[in-house]
Regions:
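Short beta-strand(s) of the beta-wing in winged-helix/HTH DNA-binding folds
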Residues: 66-67, 338
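Radical SAM enzyme [4Fe-4S]-AdoMet core and its adjacent flexible, acidic
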Residues: 176, 188-302, 307
Length: 359
């Protein structure tokens, strides 16, 4: 009989009946059945185990754990200070990323418009536009909290009458700039290092988009069309392609391992919302564009510090896996999953937590 322990970089996450081991150095995961889970829990609790038991010998072969003749404490690898997790007075919140909707007007009619999960833009027949002075004041408020990057969206942000002045204001403050666009308007006098995210719905516009943006290198085509590889093969050098699904899919195939930082971001915070701000064209602050009806405040009327405080307490620091309802709470995949706090995972997820099986 010997003792067995998982390596410092290996974390065991238990579910209702099964468990998952995360290796934070390799980014790999290992799914354990109920019996193996029971064996590992006994070992991790400091009990002696049979050194010939396959549960442990296989993990030793993988280099994920080790045997020892005596019991001793293994300090787990972590990216955070334990003191910060338990102290009463928390650190001041940091705001790293802001999504700002400049307008709701758009010169395109995407087939999935306003009918997509986690949209990057929102078109509205009730046209609103963000005043440039309000935008400048908003950016100044964000800079105080450490703003690093801004995503401008709409509608179609290039239709904003002050778009060039707005972009220059961001560039002058050494803030990384990304612009979501449909690619139908040629950008003129934009900073060369601007990141353009072109939402492509119709390949009939493909040649026009290339012509409009061929002078820029930092361009990503965002599309849900996976069947036109011939067109995509003609992209200018340096351009990237990213595919998206119009609906949230939670399946065995979408589960993935995490590295050290990703694991603790998911464990301690909401990775989708953490240190991020989303402001609509009328000044309303929302958690994200997916949940635009949940108004947190308005930058025109409310103290910006109070908005940041509410975001930090009510959204940034609320891990998805720690929700007090639904099956996420007792699921071993909660840190390997792409689930959303605003989605009904009980309906959208194909994993049966109680049975320990994917449907």
């Amino acid at each position: 009989m010997k003792y067995f322990q998982l390596n410092p970089e290996c974390y065991l996450i238990t579910g209702a009946h099964r468990s998952l081991i995360h290796n934070l150095l390799t980014g790999k995961i290992l799914w354990l059945d109920a019996n193996n889970t029971k064996q590992i829990l006994l070992a991790e609790a400091g009990n002696e185990v049979n050194e010939n038991e396959s549960t442990f010998t296989e993990l030793e072969k993988l280099g994920w754990g080790f045997f020892s003749d005596s019991k001793y404490f293994v300090d787990k690898l972590r990216s955070t200070n334990i003191y910060n997790e338990t102290k009463i007075w928390k650190n001041s919140p940091n705001l790293f990323f802001a999504t700002i909707q400049l307008n709701t007007e758009c010169n395109s009619n995407c087939s999935f418009c306003n009918n997509i999960f986690c949209p990057i833009c929102i078109k509205n027949s009730y046209k609103t536009i963000m005043d440039k002075d309000m935008f400048f004041e908003l950016i100044n408020g964000c800079i105080f909290y450490g703003l690093k990057e801004v995503l401008l969206t709409g509608g179609e942000p290039l239709l904003h009458p002050n778009i060039c002045e707005i972009c220059s204001y961001i560039e002058d403050r050494n803030i990384s700039l990304s612009i979501k666009t449909n690619g139908l308007i040629k950008p003129i006098n934009f900073p060369q290092d601007t990141k353009f995210i072109i939402l492509l719905d119709n390949f009939n516009d493909f040649d026009k988009i290339i012509s409009n943006y061929k002078g820029y290198k930092n361009v990503t085509i965002l599309t849900n069309k996976r069947n036109d590889n011939l067109a995509l093969s003609r992209l200018p050098e340096g351009w990237a392609v990213q595919f998206f699904a119009t609906n949230l899919i939670i399946s065995k195939e979408t589960m993935k391992g995490t590295n050290l930082d990703e694991f603790f971001l998911k464990k301690l915070n909401n990775p989708c919302l953490f240190s991020k701000l989303t402001v609509l064209s009328d000044g309303s602050v929302v958690p994200c564009l997916q949940n635009k009806k949940q108004i947190i405040g308005n930058v025109k009327n409310d103290e910006f510090s109070q908005i940041i405080k509410k975001l930090s307490l009510d959204y940034w620091s609320k891990p998805i896996g720690e929700r007090k309802f639904g099956k996420c709470k007792k699921c071993e995949f909660k840190y390997a999953c792409n689930s959303c706090i605003f989605a009904d995972c009980d309906k959208l997820c194909s994993y049966d937590v109680e049975a320990g099986q994917w449907k």
